[in-house]
């Protein structure tokens, strides 16, 4: 695949960029596979902490930026993550726009949770800019969809077994499930998921009308989805123990009927 060098593309600036830390996904390798939003924030960064595996030409957008290589390659000691966390927190007190540039997508096996926890503990504002994860880039190169209507409607992203203390705590994310939420919840509970497993539901992801709710599987299976979401808007359903904290921070799904009514009146 022919790549477009960053030096040949001008990254337009974003208006009103909020000071803080930006965890940006650099994509699977090629510099021109970073998102437009990611490249724009890079162009405005005051300091960038970047992974070892990114295409260094991506840093051409950072003409007047301090660059710090912090990324770990496979097999290096895990304590270096603590050092990265400290660097991000320290930099946020000295610079306006701090970027942590991570290979692939920050949230897919990118150890982003440790960095998020450190930033939240220090009360530092942050934003996550998604990137193309390697599994999708490899599928594109093969010209073979990993999901097909006839053969496979499930995609598993995993690492080597035995690394997680809770291998039974699997995360499931469902596309196009807004009209089958009760069935999804009932099926998962039947398959062994606890009834109090956390669920996050997001409507119109990344759009101005985006809304997020949280509940448990038990609450979800008795909900009336048609009374909670705007007509014909896509909904993503995220299930798993990793979302436990969101039960306290997101709008409760079981109370979303009133919120829905207010939105309907406003529109």
Where are these regions (language model features)?
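Class I S-adenosyl-L-methionine
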Residues: 1-129, 219, 234-235
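A contiguous loop/helix-start segment that scaffolds small-molecule binding in enzyme catalytic cores
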Residues: 2-15, 19-23, 94-98, 154, ...
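Short, solvent-exposed amphipathic alpha-helical segments in soluble enzyme
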Residues: 36-41, 64-65, 115-118, 143, ...
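Short, polar loop motifs at secondary-structure junctions
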Residues: 51-56, 161, 242-243
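Residues at the C-termini of beta-strands that transition into short coil/loop
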Residues: 52, 71, 130, 158-161, ...
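Short gly/pro/ser/thr-enriched loop/turn and capping motifs at secondary-structure boundaries
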Residues: 56-57, 75-77, 133-137, 206-209
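Short hydrophobic/aromatic-enriched beta-strand-loop microsegments
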Residues: 66-72, 123-127, 146-151, 194-201
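Class I SAM-dependent methyltransferase SAM-binding "motif I" and its flanking Rossmann-like core
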Residues: 105-169, 211-214, 263
């Amino acid at each position: 695949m022919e790549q477009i060098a960053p030096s040949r593309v001008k990254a337009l600036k974003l208006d009103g960029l909020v000071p803080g830390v930006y965890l940006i996904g650099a994509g699977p390798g090629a510099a021109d596979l970073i998102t437009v939003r990611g490249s724009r924030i890079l162009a405005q960064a005051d300091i960038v902490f970047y992974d070892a595996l990114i295409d260094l030409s991506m840093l051409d957008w950072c003409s007047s930026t301090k660059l710090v290589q912090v990324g770990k390659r496979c097999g290096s000691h895990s304590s270096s993550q603590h050092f990265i966390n400290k660097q991000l927190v320290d930099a946020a007190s000295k610079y306006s726009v701090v970027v942590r540039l991570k290979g692939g997508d920050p949230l897919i096996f990118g150890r982003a949770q440790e960095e998020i926890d450190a930033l939240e503990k220090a009360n530092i504002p942050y934003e996550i800019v998604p990137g193309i994860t390697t599994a999708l880039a490899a599928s594109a190169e093969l010209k073979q969809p990993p999901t097909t209507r006839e053969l496979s409607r499930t995609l598993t992203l995993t690492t080597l077994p035995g690394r997680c203390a809770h291998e039974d705590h699997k995360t499931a994310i469902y596309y196009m499930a807004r009209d089958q939420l009760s069935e999804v919840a009932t099926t998962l509970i039947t398959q062994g998921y606890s009834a109090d497993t956390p669920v996050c539901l997001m409507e119109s992801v990344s759009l101005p009308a985006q809304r997020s709710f949280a509940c448990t599987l038990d609450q979800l299976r008795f909900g009336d989805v048609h009374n909670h979401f705007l007509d014909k808007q896509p909904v993503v359903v995220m299930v798993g123990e990793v979302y436990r904290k969101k039960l306290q921070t997101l709008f409760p799904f079981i109370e979303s009927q009133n919120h829905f009514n207010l939105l309907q009146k406003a529109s």
